Amino acid sequence: EIPVFKKNVKRTKQFCKENNYHYKMWDLKDCEELVVEKYPEYICLWSEFRFDIQRCDFIRYLILHQYGGWYVDCDVYPTQNLDSLLGFDECFTTWSNDHKRKPYNAVMYSVAKNPLFIEIMKEVEKRVIEKQQIKQYDTWKGRLVFYTTGHHMLASIVPKSSIHELMLIYNEEKGIYISADNPYFYDENITSWWTDPQKKG
């Protein structure tokens, strides 16, 4: 177990308790049951993903479509009440120094059954079929993930009006300190799947 994940999950649970939000941690069994029972059209895609991180990305879109609510990565925790953000159909975050304002899928909100997430699922499927056949992506793990299930894929779908600066991102080891003016989330930006040199792209 990654210590930062354990620490920040505990903080998120406490935050939810204090703010009267329901908290759920999804395990692999939960995720696979959701695909089979609610999204059987994506069972083949689920098995076609080359990397587990693609499944981790994709399942969050299914969860938000099915149930709505907030998705928060394990290295992230909320820092202030989120009720003021609940007037949106969807809410995506971005790094405040990203001039292209690409949506960051570590933190996302949606109402249930939001058709935007159907578009996202279809775009993921299209890109996986296309890009996993390209030989260069055999060694470009990062690029494959970002362009099939990550922020580059989302940037082609999510309207700019749904993307907001809500994050404080701090990682001393990486030399990262980026903060919105009024951050709602603290992100330690662990990117645990990126540690193996073979995963670079």
Show which residues each predicted segment covers.
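Small-residue hinge/turn detector
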Residues: 57-69
